[in-house]
Amino acid sequence: MHLKKNRTIFSRRLDSPVVATNGGSVIKAKSRWQIGPHGTRSFSFIAVERLALPAHTLSPRSRSLATLTDDPHQLFKYDLNPDVSQVLFFWISISALLTSLDGKCYYRNGQESITISGAYFGDFDLPRRWDLPSDFRLSPICCSRPFQTRGRILRQISSFLLLFNFSLEEAYEALRTFEVLGIEKTAELSKAICKSVLGTLESSSSTPKDLFHALGVNGILKCSSKEETFEDQTSKTDLHLSDAEGTFRSIKALSQSDGRWRYSSNNPESSTFAAGIALEALSGVVSLASSEIDQFMIGAVKNDIVKLFDSIEKYDDGTFYFDEKLVNMREQQGPLATTSSVVRGLTAFSSVITESLNLPGDKILGIAKFFLGIGIPGDTKNFFDQVDLLACLENNRQVKVNTVLGSHAPPLTVTLVRAFSSSARDNSIIENQELKFDPQDAVYFLDDLPASFDVGEYIFVFKMLVQDSEQQTVYATGTLTQVPIYVTGLIKIENAKIAVLDSDLGSVETQKKLDLAGESTVSVSANHLQKLRLSFQMSTPLGNAFKPHQAFLRLRHETKVEHTFVVGSSGKKFEITLDFLGLVEKFFYLSGRYDIQLTVGDAVMENSLLREIGYVELDLPEPPENASRPPPQPVDPYTRYGPKAEITHIFRAPEKRPPEELSLAFLVLTILPLFGFIIGLLRLGVNLKNFPTSAVPATFAVIFHLGIAAVLLLYVLFWLKLDLFTTLKTLCFLGVFLMVVGHRTLSHLASASAKLKSA
Amino acid sequence: MARSTGKDAQALFHSLRSAYAATPTTLKIIDLYVGFAVFTALIQVVYMAIVGSFPFNSFLSGVLSCVGTAVLAVCLRIQVNKDNKEFKDLPPERAFADFVLCNLVLHLVIMNFLG
């Protein structure tokens, strides 16, 4: 990568916004259209510098871009602290825009110059360290290769894209997946996405992240905008990042000693995911750098990478993956995302540094195996991670016999080192046979198997060596790969018989032949004094004895009570004898018809069978008193939870009430004594002579009587509708009032009578 | 002998009546009131005997109100009676005020218990 040396024209601390830079010097920038090896195309990350140019010379497109950058506040309005990531985002977006618009750039005065803003940290004091957002990505776009389509997830991706409510980030991931897998995108899909992309690019209020994703999508879809307004066409403009060293150093400063990276200077947590991101960022910085980055720094980063590989985790089957150690990160990235981010960072970094990274080959292999082994993940984002990583590994050509996505392997010798039966690991049947290569199918095959290969389970061990020695550094091969192989065949079952024997003498009462291959059934009958015997013989096609994995005999009663027995074997002969005398209690004394079912099965047996042989009428004695009942059979779940019997509630019979007339009669009777009282009073000659006549005492007396009447009325109301609390509350007031009035009245009366007495 | 007892009883009754006529009117009023209350209670008991005591609380509250008010009236009579040396210094108005207050409290409780 050839970079021109130029002086940096902006410094960290400026007192005034840089609109016109010192002398308006031009930084040559070069846009890269590398047609690299293997037909890949990579965007280089170009940095741009702003010049002071009069606005009217700008075309509408660049004017909009320029206005985007005119205002320093606008550039950083999304974050008060301008950080490298945002600046880089912006630069990358501009560069990608330029390149995607076929590299047309604006120029002035015949020179190749660019009018888009540089980083001016104008009014802001640049922090010494920069924060890295967690989703900062710069990824090269690689060539794709045909791959087997996985219908479901791809349909999912395209369907959700078609629904037009996607975010640009999701669109980018989806399109990259499609691109790697070589799937064509439908026309209306592309149109819809392009519309959104262009809308984002043209609007001045897009965040840098939106711009980044928009340009990523644009790069894949190659949406072209009709307003191509750059004045002149040039294919070479040099752009780069000034002060790359400082940026590099700052990013590097966030690294930890165990190879992981911190997200920001404020956040002490470190993560492997961030390490991947940081490596990508560093590679971007290096590619953008105007001058050579100090080799010492690069060496330090390589050390970090080695340390990072020390933290790799593995499963037992040889797959490797990266995972986070801490669980309290703000966004927990799974092993998929973490590993893919790390590999992305590694590939980006290795593509920009001059010498090669020495990475442990088996670990890369393990990572590839991990990703191939997880099948198709359900989440679109995981799928993107998987496919992206496989594409990066593919690009770096670091995988085994078939490269990860199925491309051609270089000339190899594949040796079958050993093949042995899994049960007899010491004797290997085949040793050191070299497999021949069929160039048409690109397959290695072994011509002739020895005749002594019988059915069964074997393990084949393969070893691969790259023939061409110079390519050995490019490709990493696994050491010895073990592949389990099952050799299946038809097992012969013959001489099947079922017999009922008398237990005492052992003589055969009835014996019937069974045709296990056919469909016929037999029926026998027995009582509890007899035995039932089933026998047959099994042998492999080559005549050896064969012991199947499963050989069961099952008796099922009419009431669905089942009993299962294992058929024992000796050599080729399989036999089971059921002695009903001993089994009477096990069968719960249930007499009747039992269906017989025979099951013989094994993985290598191509004619496994599960068959109803027939039935046996069993006559068992009566169960004694304390015999165990058969276990309750499972009930149909619908009846178990269905509606139960209805319960009718019996209400308490109401008490007998007296007839209404009687009650009314007695009510009248009860009131009568009151009248009797009044009449008696009159007969006694009650008078109101003592009632005070003068005004004030008279009113008090009246009020006193009224008060008492009011209290009694309150009681009546209390009985009718009031509750105790309101009654008490009212009673309080009334009572106090009555006390006062009564006291007045009665004291007046008392004084009056005292006067009368004394007088 | 029966005749003499009969005559004695009559003589006793007559003397009782004549003595009673000498009591002050206020006391007679109070006596009348007591009689009225007791009579009401009796009628309620008879009713309960006929129809059964289903809402027993109502029966109790009815009977007890009558009995309670009769008791209070008796207390009033004792306190108001001038011949009673014990309550000589208690003004009758005060006794009456007590009577009214206690009745009111009694009837509150009765009303609550009546249901």
From Swiss-Prot, chain B:
It is found in: Endoplasmic reticulum membrane. Its main location: endoplasmic reticulum. The chain crosses the membrane at residues 32-52, 56-76, 95-115. Residues 53-55 are lumenal. Residues 1-31, 77-94 are cytoplasmic. It is a multi-pass membrane protein. The keyword Mitochondrion does not apply. Keywords: Apoptosis, Endoplasmic reticulum, Membrane, Transmembrane, Transmembrane helix. Belongs to the DAD/OST2 family. Component of the oligosaccharyltransferase (OST) complex. This is Dolichyl-diphosphooligosaccharide--protein glycosyltransferase subunit DAD1. The lineage of its organism: Eukaryota, Viridiplantae, Streptophyta, Embryophyta, Tracheophyta.
